């Protein structure tokens, strides 16, 4: 493998860490150190633009690709730099890129901390060729730059003229139809889109225009709705008048019937003296009934006052001698084994009627049978049903719950039973109406 003479002449690089090949203004390549900045998550790099559009993103990617292509082996750089045609083409491409970027933004390149001690030197023959070709390149570049500047000025002037024409047309449209103007969002692309051919306007007759037809259809529809509303209002008015007329007829007919009924009454055969005598009898009965009720109430109050003035022994003797008369007193019957109990109730027992004097303790339905001969397991209520009982009766069953709080022998329970519990204290005094204060 042959090594180029230019590389042989270069002094050896002691360390290439952090060094990248950089091309200077003369087209020479040298290794320069760059300042490596620390990467911070979520922070924008220094070389990245603050704001960018789609066109700038594409240009930024193009610059990255161009830089990647520059970082090639030094052998290919030496071969390309020796050819003046390739060098002129590269310089022209780089100038185009720089000119395009200058119109948009400025690319921040990596900061150069320092340069290497030795730079790459070309051979004498290549240096002479470069000096001779630089003058030709400068002349070509000046002409090219002047031509491009003229084209850019012409393009800018054309764009400005078009914008003025569009603004004049929009101003005329706004003055003619201010009520129908609406805000629209328009998207403009590059100059190529603006230079597209415009369509020729076509005249449309007024009767064939869609907006006029829609306006006429809307007016016709509104007119139909108004006519329908008037028709509905007229129908409601007629219906209301009909209801009022019917109500008036009903009132007239009712008045006629009442007058006919009054005329049908025959008062010729009435006797005023008989009516007066009947009225006197009714009034006498009412007076007698009121007097009896008043005397019974006074008698009851006097009896209550007399019983209150009696002593305890006299009251007991009085009750034994004159027992309380109970209306519809029930006969205490004997219930059979597992017989169902029916409660007579306490309402309306003050009325003396035969139905309230029946024996409610008499057996009914299946209670007529003797259930003592049944097996022990069947001697329960509702046997074989969902409402059956657990025990036959609670006479031989101890249902005391010894785990309950009130069944425990504690100081708190003992104090409660001695002081507050009813039926467990040795007190046989008659309770008074007023509550005694306990200390």
From Swiss-Prot:
Disulfide bonds listed in the record: none
Disordered: annotated span: 1-200
Biased composition (Acidic residues): 71-81, 112-122, 131-144, 178-195
Glycyl lysine isopeptide (Lys-Gly) (interchain with G-Cter in SUMO2) crosslink residues: 67, 249, 357, 371, 381, 415, 418
Localization in the cell: Nucleus
Residues recorded with modification Phosphothreonine: 267
N-acetylserine sites (modified residues): 2
GO cellular component, one term: U2-type precatalytic spliceosome
Keyword match Ubl conjugation: yes
Keyword vocabulary terms for this entry: Acetylation, Isopeptide bond, mRNA processing, mRNA splicing, Nucleus, Phosphoprotein, Spliceosome, Ubl conjugation
Function: Involved in pre-mRNA splicing as a component of the spliceosome.
Subunit structure: Component of the spliceosome B complex. Interacts with PRPF38A (via N-terminal interaction domain).
Homology family: Belongs to the MFAP1 family.
PANTHER family on file: MICROFIBRIL-ASSOCIATED PROTEIN (PTHR15327)
Protein name as it appears in the record: Microfibrillar-associated protein 1
The organism of origin for this protein: Bos taurus
